[in-house]
C-alpha cells in the first residue's frame, strides 16, 4: 500500500516546493505567497494539484512515485474538505485525467482500487461518490461504462454521513428480533460482522477492552446477504456510528476512528 502523508505537514511541505519536478517525485504546484493559512493553501492545492502532471506521458503514468503516490496524497487531502471544495478538486482532475485512454485506464483503476478494495485504508464513500458523479457526466465514458458507474454510485451513496441510516431488522445475540428504529435517544454503534471472520473476532475483542461511554448502544449484527445488500457492505467487519436520531456520523470507519470520535464527544461535554 502506498504511504499516506500527514495532512498538516504535507500542506506546509508543499509550500516550500518548487514546481520543477524531480525524476521520481510528484510535480506539486507552487502555492502563492499570498495564501497564509493552512486552510487557504489546502483549498488552492486541491484545485491546482494536477497542474504540472503530464497526463499524456506514459512514463509518468507508470511511475508509482508520481502517478499512484500523487493520487493517494490527493484523495487523502480531499477527504478532509467539505463537499464544495472536494468537488472543485475532483472536477479539475477529471477535466484532464480521462481525455486519453492510458490516463483514463490508469486513474480509473486507482480510483477503484483505493475506494473499493476492502483492505484499503482510503475507503471513503463520500469522496468516492463525488468521483463517480463526475465520471457519470464525463463525455469520455460510454453508455455501457456509465451504467456500471451508476450502479457503483448508487451503492456509494447509501447511508452517507449526515443522512438517515436505513432502518433494518436484525437479530442480536439474545436471539430476539430488533429494529434499528427502536434505538433512539442514544447514540448507536453498528458492528456488522461475519461469525467466520477471524479479523472480526480480533476487532470485537479489541473493542471490548475499550471504554465506550455510557449511553451508547453497541449492536453486534451478523451481516447476512440481505443486510450486506441494504448497507452495501464491502468488508468485515463494517462499523457505523449513528447519532440519537439514527443519522450517520461515521460510515465504514476503523475501530480507531470510532474511538477517536467517541473520545471527542466526551471531551465536548
Predicted regions and their residues:
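Bacterial Sec-dependent N-terminal signal peptides
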Residues: 1-25
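Oxidative protein folding and maturation machinery
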Residues: 23-167, 172
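Short, acidic, Ser/Thr-enriched surface-loop or helix-capping motifs
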Residues: 172, 242-243
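Short active-site neighborhood of thiol/selenol oxidoreductases, capturing the structured segment around
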Residues: 176-205
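Typically the conserved alpha-helix immediately C-terminal to a functionally engaged Cys/Sec
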Residues: 199-212, 255
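Thiol-based oxidoreductase modules, predominantly thioredoxin-like and allied folds used
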Residues: 214-226
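Structural micro-motif
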Residues: 231-240
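Non-catalytic, surface beta->alpha helical segment in thiol-disulfide oxidoreductase systems
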Residues: 244-269
